Amino acid sequence: MSQEATIIAVDNSDYMRNGDFFPTRLQAQNDAVGLICQSKRQRNPENTIGLLSLANTEVLCTLTNDVSKIYNRLHLVEPKGRIIFCSSIRIAHLALRHRQLRHQKMRIVCFIGSPILEDEKELTRLAKRLKKEKVNVDIINFGENETNEQKLSEFIDTLNGKDGTGSHLISVAPGTVLHDTLMTSPVVAGEDGSGMAGAGLGLEFGLDGAEDPDLLYALRVSMEDQRMRQEHEVNGDGSNTSVVATSLPAGSGTSEEAMLQQALAMSMQMNNTESSSLPMDIDLAAMSEEDQIAYALRMSLQQMGEETTQPTTTTLESDKTIVEPSGVAMDIDQTPTKVTENPNLSSSSGTLAAATSAVPTSADLDVMYDAEFLESVLQSLPGVDTQNEDVRKAINALTKSQSQRGSKKDEKEDEDKQNS
């Protein structure tokens, strides 16, 4: 697109204190100026923008491509006095004639929020001169529509001439949002409405992507994360949901985008792993008596093993602390040692000797798998009939497997003795 030099003339009269545009006319005007600056910069980065006040006809900021300077000067504007329309437009034209890039087209964007004191003849003479100098003027009329509508319409018609294009008059009714109205107007969207489409996502969230790309990218990522979370809640089936690679909008830096996608995928995998690692409910009613007995014995042995696997701490007189698992025999010096209890362990763990004595030995296992011992344990359980055929089969199976293991162990010890 062609390059353009634009002077934005803002109304800073006392009428701008009115609250028919939320929160005030002045604040609504400032938001609209920010929108126009963003659209101009999005169309062409070589566009330059200046700022002028109508009440005291002061050039607040000369032509620049640094939008932050416009914002800084704009927030210093205070309402006072009345506007001088014709003199302000002439000064804006003079500032445009002194632009550095002569090939830039000249345009004035003027906000009118108070009555215009000049008569129609003076406005017509000014319009003819601007047309001769090839200066386009866009006027946003808000707040005082009935008073200024006729004058401004003739002014714009004189500027456009027979072509009828180039300059625009936008009248905004009180009570509406000035920023939203300009979004679809020719001032921002252009003659054919392609200005906003060409700007892409630059005006998303009301931010200029060229000014703060990191903040814009963070907002996009946050919105995408929220969208994924909502879709996950709608689908519902968290256990059957597979991890899908997230497609995020293009941002500043592909490496950061890839890391973010990886982090989101890992987070979803961790959630699925945590849900799958939880113990499943056991339906005891669906199990046979033999399976119930085997399950009860297995849980009892597992609980006993967990209680005896806590580490113990042995403190030697040489100020060396050795942490070792319970039940592991170690060859140490005959130097007198002192056994201390780890304060982090429960009081029931006791000393090292007490902990090692809790580990089941081969003799203890023989007793546990003894048929009479199992019958006595099962008789103490409510609802268990030891004379039941299934119960007898389960006891015989457990004792038989233990006896087979013991015989194999004895055969191995005999072979080792013969080899030695």
UniProtKB/Swiss-Prot annotation:
Q: Which residues form the VWFA domain?
A: 1-174
What residue stretches are annotated with the UIM domain? 210-229, 255-274, 288-307
Segments of skewed composition (Basic and acidic residues): 407-420
**A cellular component term (GO) from this record?**
nucleus
Provide the residue span(s) of the region labelled Disordered.
392-420
The record's GO molecular-function terms, alphabetically, read: polyubiquitin modification-dependent protein binding
Tell me yes or no: is NAD among this UniProt entry's keywords: no
Pfam families the record matches:
UIM, VWA_2
GO annotation terms (biological process): proteasome-mediated ubiquitin-dependent protein catabolic process
Name the InterPro entries on file: PSMD4 (IPR027040), PSMD4_RAZUL-like (IPR049590), UIM_dom (IPR003903), VWF_A (IPR002035), vWFA_dom_sf (IPR036465)
SUPFAM superfamilies to which the protein is assigned, alphabetical = vWA-like
Gene3D superfamilies for the chain: 6.10.250.380, 6.10.300.40, von Willebrand factor, type A domain
Family recorded in the similarity comment: Belongs to the proteasome subunit S5A family.
Name listed for the protein in its UniProt record: 26S proteasome non-ATPase regulatory subunit 4
Q: Which organism is it from?
A: Schistosoma mansoni
Its lineage opens with: Eukaryota, Metazoa, Spiralia, Lophotrochozoa, Platyhelminthes
